[in-house]
Regions:
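Conserved, short, structured surface segments that act as functional micro-motifs
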Residues: 1-58
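Long, low-complexity serine/threonine/glycine- and acidic-rich segments characteristic of extracellular
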Residues: 47-52, 59-189
């Protein structure tokens, strides 16, 4: 925020003194904003990954529209399963708003499971100040640049700090054998 005097911006944080972990003041109940609007998942993308002679390569994203049910859960607008390669990851395009506020907010948590087994969880919560420069490592920039929403990669990049990921199996990569059908669930908070 900009200081009323026109001076430098002010930034406030609450941290655990001993560990220097940042408190999420909303989830900790320190601040209770008027907010009963859940985050909205706009689209889901799937990207297949592989290596060619030791060099990482990835496919173009396959994009899927979603629709929200009356109960608040989402499903793809298509009925047939998503065609997936032997390994890949999901990217979630989502937005969060709060009551009475026009601008959007980022998600603070995203989770992925496959066949009921947790594979990935990202939390924008509890990291130390020195790691705050790494908190955007989950953004999938090729889509983020043209989206009005937050675009989160449900996979850990090679140099991304582990503190952002309380759940991580195979760096979030979903593996699928030929002919295998897997059921994936994605949650956004």
């Amino acid at each position: 925020t900009r200081a009323p005097s026109g001076g430098p911006p002010l930034h406030y944080e609450l941290r655990d003194t001993r560990t220097q972990r940042l408190y999420n003041v909303v989830s900790a109940g320190i601040i209770r904003p008027d907010d009963d609007l859940p985050p909205r998942i706009m689209r889901i993308h799937y990207i297949e990954v592989d290596t060619v002679q030791g060099i990482p390569v990835h496919s173009r994203p396959e994009s899927y529209a979603v629709v929200r049910s009356a109960g608040g859960s989402y499903r793809l607008t298509r009925e047939e399963p998503v065609g997936a390669g032997r390994k890949g990851y999901f990217v979630v395009e989502a937005s969060d708003r709060r009551n009475g506020v026009g601008n959007t907010f980022g998600l603070w948590r995203l989770a992925l499971s496959a066949d009921g087994k947790p594979l990935f969880e990202y939390r924008m919560d509890g990291f130390e100040q020195a790691q705050s420069r790494c908190c955007d490592a989950v953004s999938y920039y090729p889509l983020q640049l043209t989206s009005r929403n937050e675009v989160i990669r449900a996979a850990q990049l090679a140099q991304s700090p582990a503190c952002f990921y309380p759940v991580m199996e195979e760096r979030g990569i979903v593996r699928t054998e030929a002919g295998q059908t897997r059921r994936s669930r994605i949650g956004a908070w």
